[in-house]
Design a protein with these regions (language model features):
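Acidic, proline/glycine-enriched N-terminal capping motif
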Residues: 2-141
Length: 141
C-alpha cells in the first residue's frame, strides 16, 4: 500500500459510533406490498403496524447506512401464476415507508440515507416463520 492509498478514505468505513447502532432484527408477521382489492384487505395495514411496533424502540439512524433485508414469505405468497412470489420492489416500498416512521425518522432525507441495499425473499413453511429480517449498519461515505 502506498502513502497515497493510506490517505484515501474508505467509501464504506464504519464510524466510531457505528458499532453502537448496528440493528439486527427479524420483524414477525406476514409482509405485504400494497393495499389489496380482495381477500384480507386489512392485512397490509396490519403488517405496517407490526413493522412500526417492532422497530419503534430501536436506535435512530441519522446518517448514511447499509441495509440488508430478507423477506420471509409463507407458501401462499407463491401462487401458480406468480411462482417467484411478490415483487421485491413493492415489498421494500412498504417496509421502507414504515421504517421512515421509526428507525429512519431522524435521518435527513429519510430512506435516502441508505447508500447500499441488499434485498432478497425466501419461502418459509409457515405463517409463524414469516416476516422480514433486517440488518442496518451506519457507515461513513
Amino acid at each position: 500500500m502506498t502513502k497515497a492509498d493510506e490517505r484515501k478514505p474508505d467509501l464504506f468505513s464504519l464510524t466510531p459510533e457505528a458499532s453502537m447502532f448496528y440493528i439486527n432484527l427479524t420483524i414477525k408477521g406476514v409482509p405485504y406490498c400494497k393495499m389489496k382489492s380482495r381477500g384480507n384487505q386489512e392485512a397490509p395495514q396490519k403488517w405496517s403496524e407490526e413493522v412500526v411496533r417492532q422497530t419503534s424502540a430501536l436506535p435512530k439512524i441519522k446518517d448514511a447506512c447499509i441495509m440488508k433485508v430478507t423477506f420471509l414469505l409463507p407458501p401462499d405468497k407463491y401462487p401458480r401464476d406468480m411462482p417467484y412470489g411478490p415483487d421485491l420492489d413493492n415489498l421494500l416500498k412498504r417496509l421502507l415507508d414504515d421504517l421512515k416512521r421509526t428507525i429512519l425518522s431522524e435521518a435527513r432525507g429519510g430512506d435516502s440515507c441508505i447508500v447500499s441495499l441488499t434485498v432478497m425473499k425466501t419461502k418459509v413453511s409457515s405463517y409463524e416463520e414469516s416476516g422480514a429480517h433486517i440488518e442496518v449498519m451506519p457507515v461513513r461515505v
